[in-house]
């Protein structure tokens, strides 16, 4: 487990205060005091003005997953900015940051940082390690891969199905970033684009994957894991709020998802894996948010087309999403 450097008498608070911008609100500066100048009802000549109003500032603790001192980051509104802040804190090129996990230094895809961060979550950044090229013979239509991405241009393996084509190739592991297929660069591609390319590869042919694995500490070099189910392992984050990172628009501090929303997001994420070979809790959360107040599947389809038209979801998938949201609403899990 990575350790922080040095001894600390008291950990700094996660929420600090900073000065508000000048000119916000009336501070009474320059207003005349009581006649005679001796009263205490207004500001006096020669004294500094009252302190400006304070506003909360969100500060998160972070480490490099393979081991580093503890850094503190703030002032980001999306995943790309988050990676930039992490790189700045540890003096790394931003492109070295592959993905982040919450409250564990392990390559645990159930703890992957997506679109939400608990206000007391500890962020572990996984950076690029060994590069490798692997030849794969596509003996079946399905390779057994589930793809996700980091929201900043890197697609990587989130899950490997047991007994699948890829499962028999032990050089390929969960967490490996897919840089290229047959020499075609995939940097900047979304997960669904990579999944589609893999699906379209002809059966009975050999193809080449160029991969980069996360850098490992000595205690992390062990047999690979195909990924567990959500909710496994200790829940270390205790913040009651969550910072919602959006690809468009500012980040917002929100309450934790309700039980209905959590279950609906999980079911929609399962549908994304089943239909498209990807997992993306942020995308699933957006779909639940769009669908929870819709009255029928047609309204949901219209909302998805307007907000997420690039995905071109098939009608049967939209219908299943509508059903999953409806089941979660009535507690039919």
UniProtKB/Swiss-Prot annotation:
InterPro entries: GH2_GIPC (IPR055349), GIPC1-3_GH1 (IPR056814), GIPC1/2/3 (IPR017379), PDZ (IPR001478), PDZ_sf (IPR036034). SUPFAM superfamilies: PDZ domain-like. GO terms for biological process: cellular response to interleukin-7; chemical synaptic transmission; endothelial cell migration; G protein-coupled receptor signaling pathway; glutamate secretion; negative regulation of proteasomal ubiquitin-dependent protein catabolic process; positive regulation of cytokinesis; positive regulation of melanin biosynthetic process. Disulfide bonds: none annotated. It is linked to Oculopharyngodistal myopathy 2: A form of oculopharyngodistal myopathy, a muscle disorder characterized by progressive ptosis, external ophthalmoplegia, and weakness of the masseter, facial, pharyngeal, and distal limb muscles. The myopathological features are presence of rimmed vacuoles in the muscle fibers and myopathic changes of differing severity. OPDM2 inheritance pattern is autosomal dominant. Belongs to the GIPC family. This is PDZ domain-containing protein GIPC1. It comes from Homo sapiens.
